């Protein structure tokens, strides 16, 4: 069974979520206070957000591109809270202390098995799920059933929020609107990246 999933975000009045912009809005600490009150036992971010805030600058480059080729998972150690990264192709490298934060990385099954070996060697949990592209629905089932996650927070960026929305996985949205306006063209929105032009609105 999948966790109860809440997308928790802070945006400008016009719905933009550029980190440098939202950091300039007063009282951003209120966002993190609300995050604590939501009592998540795992928080998930997309590759770009994790690259900006947590991963090492240089990407992981596999010498052997043989894919893992099947659905698998690895629990480095059971935890009460996980920091989750979506990294479809296995490109993020992590600092040595990443395991201290109970990091969990989700890839698809085309990701090189060498990357999963790298994660295992560094005491990092992982899930490989989806023949071509991550199967979000199935990976959430694994997260709930095998890792014991009951309440999951999706905290950006806009494309991963949009992917969870499109997959019908969101149970709730928590949106804090800061007292600022972005207005710049091309900046990510709270929910972004859905290319299906006839995509119906979600209620």
Feature annotation, model-predicted:
Residues 1-203:
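Enzymes that bind and transform nitrogen-containing heteroaromatic metabolites
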């Amino acid at each position: 069974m999948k966790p109860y999933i809440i997308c928790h975000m802070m945006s400008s009045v016009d719905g933009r979520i550029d980190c440098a912009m939202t950091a300039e809005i007063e009282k951003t600490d209120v966002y993190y206070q609300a995050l604590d009150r939501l009592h998540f036992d795992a928080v998930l971010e997309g590759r770009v957000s994790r690259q900006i805030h947590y991963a090492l600058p240089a990407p992981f480059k596999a010498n052997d591109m043989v894919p893992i080729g099947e659905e698998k998972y690895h629990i480095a150690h059971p935890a009460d809270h996980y920091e989750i990264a979506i990294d479809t192709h296995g490109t993020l490298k992590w600092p040595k202390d990443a395991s201290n934060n109970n990091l969990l990385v989700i890839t698809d099954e085309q990701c090189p098995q060498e990357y999963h070996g790298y994660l295992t060697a560094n005491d990092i949990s992982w899930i490989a799920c989806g023949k071509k592209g991550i199967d979000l629905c199935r990976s959430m089932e694994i997260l709930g059933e095998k890792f014991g996650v009951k309440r999951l927070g999706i905290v950006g960026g806009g494309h991963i929020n949009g992917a969870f929305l499109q997959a019908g996985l969101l149970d709730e949205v928590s949106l804090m609107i800061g007292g600022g306006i972005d207005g710049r063209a091309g900046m990510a929105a709270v929910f972004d990246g859905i290319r299906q032009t006839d995509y119906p609105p979600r209620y």
